[in-house]
C-alpha cells in the first residue's frame, strides 16, 4: 500500500482548547484528505491545541487495512475524512465518542456506528471545458457509457478509494444491483481510465488528460476556484450527498489527543473554514453553506443507504475486481 507521512511542528496553544500535558503533545492521524487540504488545515489544529500532528495520508481502503493490521498494537489515534460506509463496515476497529458539540450536528448526517460525520460530500462529474462543448457534457450516469467518451473518463479504483466506492454505490442505487444494473455499469466501466488516487482525478481533468472525471464536489470546486478550464455537472438522474467520516481508533495510544482532534474538526471555526475555503458542505446546523455551489435543494439527490453500502461492500468489490480482471 502507498502511504505518505507528514510531520508537522506544534504551534502555540490558544484559549480555545486546554493546553495538553507532555504525554498528549503528539496525535497520530490517518487521513484520505489530499495534501493541499492537510497543509491548509493542520496548522489551524496546532494553533488551537498546541499539539504536534503526525499524519499518514493514504486511500480510504489502505487506511482501514493498516488500522486492522495494527489492531494488536494501534499506532493511530484518529481516522480523519474517509468514506462513512467504510467506517460503518469496520465498526469494531473504532472507539465510540460523543464530542462536545454533538448536538450541533445535523441529524441527516449522523451515523449509527462508532464513527462521526466530518463534512458533507457530493458526488459530481467534472468536465474539461476545452475538450468538451456544453452540448457534449454528460447529463446522466448512463451517458458515461456513450462511445465518444471511450478512454476519456477518469475514475479512481473503487477498491482503493472511498469516494470511488460511493460513486459505484450511487450508480447501483439508481439502477439497481441486479444483473441489469451491473450490466449498465459494465458499459460505463468500459470507458473508464482508472487511477489509484481519487485526488488525481480532478487534476487529470484540469490538465486535459481526461475530458470527464468522477469526483467529489469539493475537489472539483478547488479547480473551478483556481480558474481552471473546468465545470461541475450534477447528474440529472441523481447523485449522493452524504457525510464523510472520522473516528477514534480503538486502543489509540493518545485517546485524549484523538478526542481533541475530533472536537477541533467539529468546531464552528473549522467547519466554516472547510466550507468557505475548501468547498465542502457543512454538517453543523449553524454553519453557512458556500454560496458559489448549487443549493442542494436544486440537486436531484438519492437516498444513500450507508448501512447497505457497508454490508454489500465485499460483494460489490468481488464484482468490481471481476470487471478489472476482464479488461
Tell me the role of every PLM-derived stretch.
Residues 107, 121, 184-188, 193-194, ...:
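Periplasmic-binding protein-like
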Residues 25-41, 56:
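Extracytoplasmic "Venus flytrap"
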Residues 85-90, 206, 211-229:
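A ligand-binding cleft/hinge motif common to bilobed small-molecule-binding domains
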Residues 32-39, 61-62, 68, 75-209:
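Extracytoplasmic ligand-binding site segments that recognize negatively charged/polar headgroups
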Residues 40-54:
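Short alpha-helix C-terminal cap/hinge motif
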Residues 249-305:
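Mature extracytoplasmic/periplasmic domains
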Residues 178-180, 282-327:
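An extracytoplasmic/periplasmic, membrane-proximal ligand-sensing/linker region
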Residues 124-131, 172, 243-254, 273-274:
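A bilobed periplasmic-binding-protein/Venus flytrap-type ligand-binding module shared by bacterial periplasmic
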